[in-house]
Amino acid sequence: MTIFDNYEVWFVIGSQHLYGAETLRQVTQHAEHVVNALNTEAKLPCKLVLKPLGTSPDEITAICRDANYDDRCAGLVVWLHTFSPAKMWINGLSILNKPLLQFHTQFNAALPWDSIDMDFMNLNQTAHGGREFGFIGARMRQQHAVVTGHWQDKEAHTRIGAWMRQAVSKQDTRQLKVCRFGDNMREVAVTDGDKVAAQIKFGFSVNTWAVGDLVQVVNSIGDGDISALIDEYESSYTLTPATQIHGDKRQNVREAARIELGMKRFLEQGGFHAFTTTFEDLHGLKQLPGLAVQRLMQQGYGFAGEGDWKTAALLRIMKVMSTGLQGGTSFMEDYTYHFEKGNDLVLGSHMLEVCPSIAVEEKPILDVQHLGIGGKEDPARLIFNTQTGPAIVASLIDLGDRYRLLVNCIDTVKTPHSLPKLPVANALWKAQPDLPTASEAWILAGGAHHTVFSHALDLNDMRQFAEIHDIEIAVIDNDTRLPAFKDALRWNEVYYGLKR
């Protein structure tokens, strides 16, 4: 069972009574056939539910009102099978607060050249019915997605499925609670921000709990539960000699297990699905949570270090979006560079907290090593390299008057040499279009040093995320040129200033 099983998407057919009962009967029949086929053949992440035809303003308004108040409804897919006068949709669309996708399709793929008549033409009017619907969306300044293609086309299935992921993630985000253990790292700017504005824009709440509250729960964990979790570690990871049963760091592993169990219990009891820690606020904890954070991220929790609640929330959102897809998604930080003509590289990592969902190794190494930052006992952590291939890094930043999503398309590569002294998980990548352009554009756009790294999602997913939440997006990819990128930032400043 996944999060998508908790939601459904309503399939709504637009028409009108002008065409008579027989035409509406055929429209309903076609709709039932299409919905059944999509549910069984399209591999969509959640179920489509066919609703009654929308043939009048009252019917359409009732559907939109019901969608708003049904917690299982993640959004609406609308198909204008015949012509459906768009003034009928104004009241419904004006109150609709769920995501909307217009499926610009028709029942038949090919025209019946020898038999086509006006009855056929009146029944299959998506070509201009869809344009009428599009006009009212533009006139009302309402953002909605559009997918064009025959309902049996696999590309259309893929695009509808990707939109469904966005719709479900938006509903999950409205209920998301972010727990901050302690505050932000002192004097850091980009990890701070307006939590009230974030809740108004996205729906997620951000609140702080004292580390002492967490410590109470951690200290309540029994030895039996710790031993059971250690057994799971033994079967899932390659333990270094120091962390094995008679190793000199075995107690550190047990303490890491205690912290993991306590953290998970605290998060579950509070209904939190994202959290932050900071190495400057660890009072009562024996080590900086490393292994615990890595494993919780792999279970779907959002996380970021140093109190960075925006990145923690974004990671949770992207975890939901990517559920069931190939590839992982993790908290990440651009840590250091490799400058080599024609082969500039970025080494990404963090002090400890990189999610094993992006690991190339089937069994990462579990080790305990010294960490000077935080001033605590040596923490346990998983060490691994990252899968290769196309990926993205994304940053959500607070500009005061709006949010900007910054995305850099990257290509992860195999580490050319072993890293025997690096005691943390890492990812190595080439930034698109090149490191100088990518880093300069990132800096000019105000991108954070913390990001969400993902092999599972791509630029199109993040564009849809920005559109569905109505926020700015700035893209750095192989098409990026700095003069044009700077111009786009200036134009966006004007556009969003006027939009306020």
Swiss-Prot record:
Domain of life from the UniProt record: Bacteria
Entry keywords, A to Z: Arabinose catabolism, Carbohydrate metabolism, Isomerase, Manganese, Metal-binding
Gene Ontology terms: biological process: L-arabinose catabolic process to xylulose 5-phosphate
Catalytic activity as recorded in UniProt: beta-L-arabinopyranose = L-ribulose
Binding residue positions for Mn(2+): E306, E333, H350, H450
Cofactor(s) required for function per UniProt: Mn(2+)
Gene3D superfamilies: 3.40.50.10940
Keyword Repeat: no
A GO CC term assigned to this protein in UniProt: cytosol
Cofactor note: Binds 1 Mn(2+) ion per subunit.
Metabolic or biological pathway, per its Swiss-Prot or TrEMBL entry: Carbohydrate degradation; L-arabinose degradation via L-ribulose; D-xylulose 5-phosphate from L-arabinose (bacterial route): step 1/3
Pfam families linked: AraA_central, AraA_N, Arabinose_Iso_C
One function term, GO molecular function aspect: manganese ion binding
EC number, as in UniProt: 5.3.1.4
NCBIfam families, per the entry: PRK02929.1 (NF002795)
Family, as annotated: Belongs to the arabinose isomerase family.
Quaternary structure and partners: Homohexamer.
Function: Catalyzes the conversion of L-arabinose to L-ribulose.
Name under which the protein is recorded: L-arabinose isomerase
Lineage, opening ranks: Bacteria, Pseudomonadati, Pseudomonadota, Gammaproteobacteria, Enterobacterales
Gene: araA
